[in-house]
Curated annotation (Swiss-Prot):
InterPro entries: Anhydro_N_Ac-Mur_kinase, ATPase_NBD. The keyword Cell membrane does not apply. PANTHER family: ANHYDRO-N-ACETYLMURAMIC ACID KINASE. This is Anhydro-N-acetylmuramic acid kinase. Belongs to the anhydro-N-acetylmuramic acid kinase family. Its EC number is 2.7.1.170. SUPFAM superfamilies: Actin-like ATPase domain. Pfam families: AnmK. It is an enzyme of class 2 (transferase). It comes from the Bacteria. Pathway: Amino-sugar metabolism; 1,6-anhydro-N-acetylmuramate degradation; Cell wall biogenesis; peptidoglycan recycling. HAMAP family: AnhMurNAc_kinase (MF_01270). The gene is anmK. It comes from Pseudoalteromonas atlantica (strain T6c / ATCC BAA-1087). CDD domains: ASKHA_NBD_ANMK.
Amino acid sequence: MNKHIEQLYRSAKKRSRLIIGLMSGTSLDGLDVALCRIEGHGTDTQIELVAFCTVDYDDGYKQKIKSVFAKRQVDLQQVTLLNPWVGVLHGQMVNQCLEKWNIAATDIDAIASHGQTIYHCPLGQHGQSEFGNATLQIGDADHLAVTTGILTIGDFRQKHIAAGGEGAPLAVYGDYLFFTSKQENRILLNMGGIANLTFLPCSADASAVFSSDIGPGNTIMDAYVQRHFSPLHYDKDSAMASQGKVHLGLLDSLLEHAFFALDFPKTTGPEVFNLDYLSVAQAHSATRQLAHEDVLATLNLFSARTIANAINDAAIELEEFNVYASGGGIHNPLLMEHILRLCPNVTAIQDTSKLGIDPDAKEAVLFAILANECLVGGQQPFGNLEQGIPNITMGKISFPD
């Protein structure tokens, strides 16, 4: 038997496994590295977040990725070069974290790598029925495995599309397995570059679970700050947005996109919601000369309105439910204030630390869960294709030699 197959067998038989989850989102701020000790599988999954850090990306990384990110036409040579380069760089970042934590690579059972999304293109976006849904992540897992010496599981989204999904959101699998409660209805809200939610009924009925993208979280706000307030990367503590005044005409123009009228589930990305989208909305509302602070105030409420509308729609038939939030948006006080005000049935929005997971680490942890299911799961089927949740095992395995 191949030694790596033996290693897979040994890892699967362990009472607990050490799995590193990696997440690099559309915000391009850094690589989230979550070291998880995981016991069990399926709905019996137990997780301890042993260590977590975000390794910041430097400006060179951001510029290279932005040259091919969310663009219909790019330099194909650059994409080809970046695919292994990102894999090696992410591997080096994992090595840095392991050294910082004083943990040997040989102690790790697997790395779960999301990679770096550079283009997400569901059928509803491109409209070419012969091609169906599509998405592309770079950061080759073989290069990551060789760089770290650790078995790596990656490229999770392709199986989701192959089985009838849109490749996103994948959070629903980990949310269902780890965060479902028999005591309360829950909405898991994640606010990264793009916001998404997962609805988890206390019945734990898989047919009632759904997950969907909502629209822009931080993506347009961050891009606007980076363009007009360089070298700042985001509106810290919503300081600039708090100084501005919402322009209702611009807000109405931003809310006109057909995506917001689509039923759940649906997916989107910065390919749609970006500075070009803002520019068109400003042209329609004659607000090209609006003060930067007023634009940021309006963008903040725009994100909040779409998020609140989604929460209200998801829970329309519920008398009681709780919202648990994660992602960079939880650090935006004005955004959180708007969402709470616009959700009359929500008395408080708690972050996922209340459920035992650092809200900044949640997405990386969820990919560790997917890797664990790839290794030892499959005995408890979970899926609902009508809600875009195919019953599948995701991830491709890359050996370190």
